[in-house]
UniProtKB/Swiss-Prot annotation:
It is a lipid-anchor; GPI-anchor. It comes from Rattus norvegicus (Rat). Glycans are attached at N59, N347, N406. Keywords: Cell membrane, Disulfide bond, Endosome, Glycoprotein, Golgi apparatus, GPI-anchor, Lipoprotein, Membrane, Receptor, Repeat, Signal. Expressed in liver, brain, kidney and cochlea. This is GDNF family receptor alpha-1.
Length: 468
């Protein structure tokens, strides 16, 4: 009985363990596509799916539409068993655009595209604390500089960039095209955008974030921060387009569409979490935000008195789509997750220093709570932009405070939904709806080996009892 138990149980346990390992192995879409094209069955279904996407863009005929959709669904179901279905891309990778093209050929919904799409990028799961450990703090770097500015962190960050060869190289590379006028245009916007993308993709976050998310106490500092991306070229235009029109334009470009989806995925606010971020990860939110810079959806600070950001667009001429337009715009302007992430970077703190909040109850429903705008008076102009230093430790250091004092600390130092009213549009809807075909959630098998071991132990006990 004992040997029979081992004979059947061990192969099953080995199978589960191998499944757990392979589940974590995810190919990038370029490699997954190459692998698929080498298999006859996969290659046939993949070509069918690509024709489906092309057919959707040119509109199916009314007579063949239903048959075509059934064939498309059949192809998608077959590909769910292949590595291509679960592939992702990496930001800044060598063949990023090609990788993203393959990804969207898999996940572009046949029913249409909506605001919130799953990110095509492999999760980074980095932390602000990782960035802080990468290089010395800016204040330490500036001990090497004779004339240090007093209180202008953004100026200090620019000087720190000049001390780093990589940062200096890529900063100069975008300053030139972004400030050089040509014919009747202010600059070469296309070259400016490309150089900005390279800057934020190639330069260490400690330096690029130091310039983009520097904490400020006065207008001179905040204005320098606002000017970081040379907005007169990269951001502003003669006219403001409608935000939904800008979104449609963004979705015609693989890079822009992907960066926008990444932003909505990683900066999703959640009022019930301690950090006000659904994913409780500030670094991933800042990475996603910076990824938008250099696309047609380039965001920037709306003024020099707050942390509110927005793309260069408004909701005029929205007609019946006004509510959807406001949802889109307010996701940028009143995003508590992003604002807390910017403040945490300025503080030199991180969300990992908190006591983990109880898991937010989420479902697979197609509606995700984005934000709730409430009218509540703020302090003096610019106060929300200032990093609180009169209370120690600020925001993300609350858990350390709890451990020292052995009392439950309050989390009210972080921004919450109720703290915004100054820049918000009152009455905006609090939900963003998605109907797009998102990638399937990865199934965790980590608990199965434990269950199998438990079952195996029970079988062994029974076997030993019978033999005795």
């Amino acid at each position: 009985m004992f040997l029979a138990t081992l004979y059947f149980a061990l192969p099953l346990l080995d199978l589960l363990m191998s499944a757990e390992v392979s589940g974590g192995d995810r190919l990038d879409c370029v490699k997954a596509s190459d692998q698929c094209l080498k298999e006859q069955s996969c290659s046939t279904k993949y070509r069918t799916l690509r024709q489906c996407v092309a057919g959707k863009e040119t509109n199916f005929s009314l007579t063949s539409g239903l048959e075509a959709k059934d064939e498309c669904r059949s192809a998608m179901e077959a590909l769910k068993q292949k590595s291509l279905y679960n592939c992702r891309c990496k930001r800044g990778m060598k063949k990023e655009k090609n990788c993203l093209r393959i990804y969207w050929s898999m996940y572009q919904s046949l029913q249409g595209n909506d605001l919130l799409e799953d990110s095509p990028y492999e999760p980074v799961n980095s932390r602000l604390s990782d960035i802080f450990r990468a290089v010395p703090f800016i204040s330490d770097v500036f001990q090497q500089v004779e004339h240090i500015s007093k209180g202008n962190n953004c100026l200090d960050a620019a000087k720190a960039c000049n001390l780093d060869d990589t940062c200096k190289k890529y900063r100069s590379a975008y300053i030139t095209p972004c400030t050089t006028s040509m014919s009747n245009e202010v600059c070469n916007r296309r070259k400016c955008h490309k150089a900005l993308r390279q800057f934020f993709d190639k330069v260490p976050a400690k330096h690029s974030y130091g310039m983009l998310f520097c904490s400020c106490r006065d207008i001179a500092c905040t204005e320098r921060r606002r000017q970081t991306i040379v907005p007169v070229c990269s951001y502003e235009e003669r006219e403001r387009p409608n935000c939904l029109s800008l979104q449609d334009s963004c979705k015609t470009n693989y890079i822009c569409r992907s960066r926008l989806a990444d932003f909505f995925t990683n900066c999703q606010p959640e009022s019930r979490s301690v950090s006000n971020c659904l994913k409780e990860n500030y670094a991933d939110c800042l990475l996603a935000y910076s990824g938008l810079i250099g696309t047609v959806m380039t965001p920037n600070y709306v003024d020099s008195s707050s942390l509110s950001v927005a793309p260069w667009c408004d909701c005029s001429n929205s007609g019946n789509d006004l509510e959807d337009c406001l949802k889109f715009l307010n996701f940028f302007k009143d995003n508590t997750c992003l604002k807390n992430a910017i403040q945490a970077f300025g503080n030199g703190s991180d969300v990992t220093m908190w006591q983990p909040a109880p898991p937010v109850q989420t479902t697979t429903a197609t509606t995700t709570t984005a934000f709730r705008v409430k009218n509540k008076p703020l302090g003096p102009a610019g106060s929300e932009n200032e990093i609180p230093t009169h209370v120690l430790p600020p925001c993300a250091n609350l858990q350390a405070q709890k451990l020292k004092s052995n009392v439950s600390g309050s989390t009210h130092l972080c921004l919450s939904d109720s703290d915004f009213g100054k820049d918000g549009l009152a009455g905006a809807s609090s939900h963003i709806t998605t109907k797009s075909m998102a990638a399937p959630p990865s199934c965790s098998l980590s608990s199965l080996p434990v269950l199998m071991l438990t079952a195996l132990a029970a079988l062994l006990s029974v076997s030993l009892a019978e033999t005795s």
